[in-house]
Regions:
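Hydrophobic residue at a beta-alpha junction
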Residues: 54-57, 86
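Basic, amphipathic DNA-recognition helix from helix-turn-helix-like DNA-binding domains
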Residues: 64-69, 73-131, 203, 239
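Active-site beta3 strand of CheY-like receiver
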Residues: 43-49, 54
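Acidic catalytic/metal-coordinating carboxylates
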Residues: 32, 58-61
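DNA-recognition element of transcription regulators
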Residues: 105-118, 152-162, 187-207, 216-223
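Short, Lys/Arg-enriched segments at the junction into DNA-binding effector domains
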Residues: 2, 115-171, 175, 218, ...
Length: 239
């Protein structure tokens, strides 16, 4: 999970980043609201951890921007030294999903992060079988079927397909997809992702006439959308 952290206090940001990184999260720190907003225009994050009092853009102003420009918006944790009830209400009403009072204790931070992520991203079934309309994903075997037809796929094609279906209607940045599937590999050709997208679009028949659209998001990445209730046919999907 990728977390973006905004705090203008360098020491606090470093401490929070270390706690989250040690817990296994991919955490990126920002000390100015403008820098965070610039990143959000081109990258996907799974959670925002925002300090209320940042000089150029307050946490509340960031939340308002996210509400207007991110669809769907990532879950948001708001952190601040303010403890008055009216401040907490203001933060939650603005769109924060939860509220942390500074100084933040590591165990409370991790518990709140896990709780917000759990609510926002449901845990996949324990048997490893996931259903999306007529598409069935067997995670342990890395196999996907359309109806009763097994679709031949490479491991990376399967992982990319599952990532897109798990994030249906959510735009995913190229950087987010690259890091999720290939890690941080600067030597990977830039067309690698586009090639994989083209292949799974054909193999899974992700086209408007079959109720789905897998389309690029300009200067950002890709998004898989369900358009209608019409179902894809297995024969077309494997051509």
């Amino acid at each position: 999970m990728r977390i973006a952290l905004l705090d203008d206090d360098l020491e606090t940001a470093a401490q929070l980043n270390a706690i989250l990184t040690e817990a296994g999260y991919d955490c990126r720190s920002f000390h100015k609201g403008y820098a965070l907003l610039r990143m959000l225009r081109s990258e996907t994050v799974d959670l925002l951890l925002l300090d209320w009092n940042v000089p150029d853009f307050s946490g509340i102003e960031i939340i308002e921007w996210v509400n207007r420009h991110c669809d769907p918006k990532p879950p948001i944790l708001l952190s601040t030294a303010r403890t008055a009830a009216e401040d907490i209400v203001t933060g939650l009403n603005a769109g924060a999903d939860d509220y942390l009072v500074k100084p933040v204790q590591p165990e409370i931070l991790l518990a709140r992060v896990k709780a917000v992520l759990r609510r926002s991203y449901p845990t996949p079934p324990s048997d490893g079988i996931e259903h999306y309309d007529d598409y069935t994903f067997d995670v342990s075997r890395e196999q996907v079927s359309l109806g009763s037809t097994l679709i031949p796929m490479t491991s990376k094609e399967f992982m990319l397909s599952l990532l897109l279906f798990r994030n249906l209607h959510r735009p995913l940045s190229r950087g987010y997809i690259f890091e999720t599937l290939w890690g941080r590999n600067p030597d990977l050709p830039t067309r690698t992702l586009d090639t994989h997208i083209s292949k799974i679009r054909t193999k899974l028949n992700l086209r408007p006439e079959n109720g789905y659209r897998l389309a690029p998001v300009y200067a950002y990445g890709y998004r898989l959308e369900r358009l209608t209730e019409k179902k894809a046919t297995p024969i077309e999907a494997v051509q």
